[in-house]
Amino acid sequence: MPALEVNSVPSSSEFPVAPEKLASIIETSARDASSDDLGACTESILVELSKASSAHKFVVSLTKVAFSDSEDFNLSIDSSIGGSWNKTKDGGYSHSVETEAGARLLATVVWVSK
């Protein structure tokens, strides 16, 4: 798979768990759930995030990007998420994980303080 860059810096100063833990939760859930079942992977991430912080509500979005290496093409994916929220307490985080099948999962976690 070609090089991929994802900005994985939390967008607020207060986040539910350390960025490294967020990445670990996403990677573990992606590895444990079938890459064909995005719903199960999303649910797994939500369960782990809820265990990690009871002070936040969470939204998780997963996008699966898969293509054949034998084809010659350009792939461009742009995504933006925003919210009307408290910028010091609420935020978002994006992370990319390569699956065993060679696909790429792009995960976005959004949190809002309760």
Curated annotation (Swiss-Prot):
Subcellular locations according to the entry: Cytoplasm; Cell projection
Keywords: Cell projection, Cytoplasm
Presence of the UniProt keyword Transferase in the record: no
Keyword field contains Ion transport: no
Domain of life: Eukaryota
GO CC terms in record: cell projection; cytoplasm
Family: Belongs to the TDA2 family.
The protein's name in its UniProt record: Topoisomerase I damage affected protein 2
Species of provenance: Lachancea thermotolerans (strain ATCC 56472 / CBS 6340 / NRRL Y-8284) (Yeast)
Lineage: Eukaryota, Fungi, Dikarya, Ascomycota, Saccharomycotina
